[in-house]
Amino acid sequence: MNLILASFSLAPCFCVRFFPSNHNNLNLLFPGQRKIQVSCGGKSEVLKSDTMEPHEAETFVNKRTLYAPIEPYSSGNLKVSDVHTLYWEQSGKPDGHPVVFLHGGPGGGTAPSNRRFFDPEFYRIVLFDQRGAGKSTPHACLEENTTWDLVNDIEKLREHLKIPEWLVFGGSWGSTLALAYSQSHPDKVTGLVLRGIFLLRKKEIDWFYEGGAAAIYPDAWEEFRDLIPENERGSSLVDAYHKRLNSDDLEIQYAAARAWTKWEMMTAYLRPNLENVQKAEDDKFSLAFARIENHYFVNKGFFPSDSHLLDNVDKIRHIKTTIVQGRYDVCCPMMSAWDLHKAWPEAELKIVYDAGHSANEPGISAELVVANEKMKALMG
């Protein structure tokens, strides 16, 4: 059998994969035998030989693991309004190419694992918690908390850190914010890496909260739905949850926040991840996640029209962009990535056939690392 050798550096070790050369386009290789070999310090070892399933055909090429855990070299708090102060941190290479990580939700906050998508020997990695989320204060606050406030915050943080321009990386709601920011400040963006596209249109909200996703997760859906009495469901569960998440009774807020968060966490992986689902039991996390997310959805993302992000693609058409989308994403179904791709064919679309929504699913995290590696080559 003829073999194609593909190797990709990941200091101090690199992964080498041998694939059957049954097609001259690596993205269209057919299933077959493969061997995975790791080289380190001049020594090589074949880890395993297995059979590639058909659903792997578009995701196995260039697969990479996440980078090793790292700690920030600096962090701080930036007051962005009379109400809000943002937590920020930097890790990686202080004089490297800047990249800003935009977390999901909105309200999800950042985590140490978010640093691991980027080569710390090349990138200056900037993470921050958006208004009301994570370590930013005040916690779960909805006042002065809109998409355009966040867009302005990103600019304030960039200026505070004296960064001329940066790569923008965002998934789920982070992709929404990345598009809004880059369309507002295209001259500050060197590239975009987007995951789990969410354009915050009515049909996307209706799919997830008004019964579409329930066809796939009817058991989890009933638990989410049944928190709301039948006589209060009306035409919108989002509105019914809004009432509870903003109740004067904190216990009512917590109960609604746990149910809202659990529904999303149950559906975020192709196979539900217990650790992820248990986040819903953390009242501090779930309150910010649910209240802020619901606040944005009730207000239609604070966009002037349902198709605002698609309508403004021309402003960023020239920016090098990779879109990574799980084929079986229930939270942000592929219709949104597909609509964006049709409006913006210049952007590369990578479909991960064995994944749902989460950036932590192996196929998605692999493609995200590859996308960041490709950006390195462009940025020198």
UniProtKB/Swiss-Prot annotation:
Q: Enumerate the InterPro entries for this protein.
A: AB_hydrolase_1, AB_hydrolase_fold, Peptidase_S33, Pro_iminopeptidase
| Gene Ontology MF terms in the entry | aminopeptidase activity
Location(s), subcellular: Cytoplasm
What is a single cellular component term in the Gene Ontology annotation?
mitochondrion
Q: Mention one GO biological process in which this protein takes part, according to its record.
A: response to metal ion
EC assignment: 3.4.11.5
Q: Which SUPFAM superfamilies match?
A: alpha/beta-Hydrolases
List each copy of the AB hydrolase-1 domain by range: 98-360
Name the Gene3D superfamilies on file. Answer: alpha/beta hydrolase
Summarizing the function annotation, the protein's role is:
Specifically catalyzes the removal of N-terminal proline residues from peptides.
PANTHER family membership:
PROLINE IMINOPEPTIDASE
Q: Which family does it belong to?
A: Belongs to the peptidase S33 family.
What name goes with this protein?
Answer: Proline iminopeptidase
What taxonomic ancestry is recorded?
Eukaryota, Viridiplantae, Streptophyta, Embryophyta, Tracheophyta
